[in-house]
Regions:
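N-terminal, membrane-interfacial amphipathic/helix-forming hydrophobic leader that caps
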Residues: 2-10, 15-119, 123, 129, ...
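Hydrophobic alpha-helical segments and helix pairs
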Residues: 142-177
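Active-site-proximal inter-transmembrane loops
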Residues: 155-163, 221-240
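Hydrophobic alpha-helical transmembrane segments
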Residues: 174, 242-251
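Alpha-helical transmembrane segments in multipass membrane proteins, preferentially the mid-helix core
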Residues: 248-260
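Residue-level signature of the transmembrane alpha-helical core
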Residues: 125, 129, 164, 168, ...
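Transmembrane alpha-helix boundary and packing residues in multipass membrane permease domains
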Residues: 95, 136, 180, 184, ...
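Membrane-interface helix/loop boundary segments of multi-pass membrane proteins
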Residues: 173-205, 209-222, 259-263
């Protein structure tokens, strides 16, 4: 009888299988499950890094005093232990972030090598070096800085190796974290403006750690005290400008490059070029009395805290925004599920 026909017979040939033949909801592929809120994952990650780093630093300091007393490691200022604890936990925290979907693979995160990668890398390196070289040229030409007289050749080669190493290592880690994982994961749920603002704000924040004096003694909770003093630069609003604007603009430009090219090679190149020239600026030049008087314009040895750097990098950002134009057609690597 018709009511006794099974589901396949009622459906007829070529029809989709009945519901009982489909996997149960709990067995559906993982991509069909609701994703964790990236903003919540980011807050949890930051909380774990800062709280864990503050708790870990005193133990590492005590361990160094017990195992290698009087060594260079044991004599490092306590803030260095806090710095390294934060960095170590930030790197270790990348694994659970990857498990939460923040590292969908080297291609999706932006570090796969493609036909345009070499051109983007060279363009970024050229733009990064040229922009800060322009700041240095202005400072030297107007008497705010002077060349360091006759650095020894061996010392110069040491600087070159260290500057290149720092440029590659720091740029790779920061671009992977801030533009690859943080911005990329936020971008898959939120608009470019929201994603770039959050990732750039975090990027700027970590560059405003103070270097406070060592504590009188180190105890289990000294890490929290030191961390509070390191973050105290945010309480002095006047000292934030123009550095916070410059770093925020840098973060926004790097996010824009990630958005427009679909990869991290252009932002990596820019970042590496800036770090290399920043290290070279510190090594090859010294401040003059005129530069000290115009510190608000020329900035300190950190370079990004002067208005001259802000103006030059703002012009650099305009050039790159105009040159990149519209996003690649069909590029959905940042917004697809």
């Amino acid at each position: 009888m018709p009511d006794r026909l099974n589901a396949t017979q009622r459906a007829g040939p070529g029809s989709p299988p009945p519901d009982r033949d489909r996997p149960a909801p709990m067995n559906r592929p993982i991509q069909d499950r609701p994703r964790l809120n990236p903003a919540g994952v980011l807050c949890g990650y930051l909380l774990g890094v800062f709280l864990g780093g503050a708790l870990l630093a005193p133990w590492l300091w005590s361990l160094a005093q017990a195992l290698v007393p009087g060594s260079g490691l044991a004599q490092q200022p306590f803030r260095r232990y806090v710095d390294r604890s934060l960095l170590g936990l930030a790197l270790l925290g990348l694994w659970p972030m990857a498990r939460a979907g923040w590292f969908p693979g080297w291609r999706r995160v932006g570090f796969s090598w493609g036909p345009c990668s070499a051109r983007e890398l060279v363009l970024g390196l050229s733009g990064g070096v040229a922009s800060l070289a322009a700041v240095a040229a202005l400072a030297l030409g107007l008497g705010a800085r002077s060349w360091l007289p006759h650095p020894p050749a061996g010392l110069f080669m040491t600087h070159l190796v260290r500057a290149i190493g720092a440029a590659v290592a720091v740029s790779f880690l920061e671009e992977l974290l801030f533009r690859g994982m943080v911005f990329g994961s936020l971008r898959r749920r939120y608009s470019f403006a929201v994603s770039a603002t959050l990732s750039s704000g975090l990027f700027a924040m970590i560059h405003f750690f103070r270097r406070p004096d060592p504590p009188a003694s180190v105890g289990p909770w000294t890490g929290f005290e030191m961390l509070g003093r390191m973050l105290g630069g945010w309480a002095d609003v006047r000292s934030l400008f123009p550095g916070i604007l410059t770093l925020g603009m840098i973060g926004g430009l790097l996010a824009w490059c990630r958005e427009r090219t679909g990869s991290l090679w252009l932002p990596f190149g820019l970042h590496a070029g800036w770090i290399f020239w920043f290290k070279s600026y510190q090594f090859l030049t010294v401040a003059t009395a005129r530069g000290d008087r115009g510190a608000r314009w020329w900035g300190s040895i950190r370079l990004h805290d002067g208005w001259a750097t802000f103006v030059v990098l703002a012009l650099t950002a305009l050039v790159f925004v105009r040159a990149l134009g519209k996003p690649k057609a069909g590029d959905d690597r940042l917004t697809d599920g």
